[in-house]
Each structure stands twice: as C-alpha cells, then as structure tokens.
C-alpha cells in the first residue's frame, strides 16, 4: 500500500488522491502532524504500507517523517538525503558543483563584511537569498553598495540562523522567463516556461506558466541535476543565459497544479506510478 504523507491538502495533493483512485492504486492518506513516530515501532497509521510519497509543506516535518519511515524499512519518495540536499540552497549548489553542472556563480558568507566583499567582487546587481525557503520569498536583488549594507544590517538585526548565512548569486539576465522541468526517476517528463515582467518568475509570485518544448539539452541537464541531489521526483529550475542553460534550483516537493493542463502531461499519475514501482 502507498502512503501519501501530508500536513496540508493543497490542490496538488487532491490531484494525487484523485489519480491514485483512478489508477486503482491501494493508498492511504497519512496526516504527519498526528503520526506517532516511535523508533522501532510501526504505528497503526502505517500498517500495510510498502512505500510512501512525502508531500508535506513543512520541510522539517517532511524530513522527520521520511527519516522515520526509512528507519522502519519503508521506501520514501523522496529519500531523506534528497530532501536535505534540495531543502538547503547551499547544499544544492555544492551538489551541482560536485557534479560539474553549470549554475550561476554562487558563494556563501557567514560574516557581514565578507558578504559585502563578495558582493563587490561579483559586481552589482547580485542576488541575496535565504538558504532555506520557497515560493520566491525573501529574495533580494541588490543593486549597489548602499543597498547591500542596509540589507545585511537588517538581516543581522533579524537574527535567526538563516539570516546569518549570506547566500550570494550573480544576477542572471533572463529573457523574461525561466524553465521548470519535472523529473520523475530517470526521466524528464514535462517542462514549462514561467514568464513574468518581474525578475522573480515563480508562479506563486504571479508568473504565468506556458508549455516549454522538452528538448534533448533541457532534458539531459535536468536529469543530471536530479541525479546530483540523489534522484527521485524533483523539479529543476533552469535559466537561459548567454553562457547557455544554468541550473538555478532543484525542488523536492514540487507543485504541479498549474502545469498539468499547460503541458498535457499526467504529472500526478507519473509521480504515483514511479512511487509504486519502489514498493518493498
């Protein structure tokens, strides 16, 4: 039996439930906040479960559940190692660098003065991101030294571990869009353009989804990026730049509600069939 782990039911999760029923897959919904996780014990909520699909909005909650099920010998999509690699932008960048994949110039500083020095060395504008976050939140396009100094001071005052790590990337000029590629297992199954007049193109921030031709180059780079973080079911974000395609991010609990109609691909069905193929 397939367990779909969740902490909030979004349209994406509803689509997964509906497709599981349509495909005739035996499944159960497991609400993670109410799941007792006692090591060495399998709770009644997991009776008969042979594989799990992790769909929690909370990264820490999903990671904890994935670790627990893995300890019980239940395969989880995605594996804890993949969640860790994708959930931390610096970890993602390091994994991509180790795999030799093209990405925007990236650096991390743990000190305000070093962060300022790196921004100056990169040249303005630069992009400052939290190492943990999604939906394009808390991203800043820093246009000059005065803005950099003010932003770094604000982050220091805010406190919190993620504001003490300064993740810095070069600003990449894009053609008003980026590319999101959906990778399931060893296959890139669909891709969309995310268009926006704003430099942040996330659909959660108002970007518009359009079908993107899944070229061999796009598919090959996306699958390699997925493999770099450990594989499974991920969404790979690509930039089109003067240097060619660059991998910007890899997302481990991808949203697809705006992409099924756009691409004509049964993304939830593909995810479910892949997860079911891993049942122990």
From Swiss-Prot:
Cofactor note: Binds 2 magnesium ions per subunit.
Binding site for Mg(2+) 2: 249, 251
Recorded superkingdom: Bacteria
Biological processes per GO annotation: lysine biosynthetic process via aminoadipic acid; protein modification process; SOS response
PROSITE patterns: ATP_GRASP
Residues covered by the ATP-grasp domain: 93-276
GO cellular component, one term: cytoplasm
Binding site for ATP: 89, 129, 133-139, 169-180, 194, 202
Family of the protein in this entry: Belongs to the RimK family. LysX subfamily.
Oligomer and partners: Homodimer.
Protein name, as recorded: Alpha-aminoadipate--LysW ligase LysX
Organism: Thermus thermophilus (strain ATCC 27634 / DSM 579 / HB8)
Gene designation: lysX
């Amino acid at each position: 039996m397939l367990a779909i782990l969740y902490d909030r039911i979004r349209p994406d999760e509803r689509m997964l439930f509906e497709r599981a029923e349509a495909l005739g897959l035996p499944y159960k919904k497991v609400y993670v906040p109410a799941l007792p996780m006692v090591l060495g014990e399998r709770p009644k909520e997991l009776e008969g479960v042979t594989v799990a699909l992790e769909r929690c909005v909370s990264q820490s909650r999903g990671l904890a559940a994935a670790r627990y099920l893995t300890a019980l010998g239940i395969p989880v999509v995605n594996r804890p190692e993949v969640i860790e690699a994708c959930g931390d932008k610096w970890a993602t960048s390091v994994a991509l660098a180790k795999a030799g994949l093209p990405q925007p110039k990236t650096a991390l500083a743990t000190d305000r003065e070093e962060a300022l020095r790196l921004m100056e060395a990169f040249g303005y504008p630069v992009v400052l991101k939290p190492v943990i976050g999604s939906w394009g939140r808390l991203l800043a396009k820093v246009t000059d030294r005065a803005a950099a100094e003010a932003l770094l001071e604000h982050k220091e005052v805010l406190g919190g571990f993620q504001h003490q790590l300064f993740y810095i990337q070069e600003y990449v000029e894009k053609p008003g869009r980026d590319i999101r590629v959906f990778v399931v297992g060893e296959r890139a199954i669909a891709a969309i353009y995310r268009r926006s007049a704003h430099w942040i193109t996330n659909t959660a921030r108002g970007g518009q989804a359009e079908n993107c031709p899944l070229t061999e180059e796009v598919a090959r780079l996306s699958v390699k990026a997925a493999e770099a973080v450990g594989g499974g079911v991920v969404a790979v974000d690509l930039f089109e730049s003067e240097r060619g395609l660059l991998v910007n991010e890899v997302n481990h609990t991808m949203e697809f509600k705006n992409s099924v109609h756009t691409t004509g691909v049964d993304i939830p069905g593909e995810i479910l069939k892949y997860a079911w193929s891993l049942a122990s």
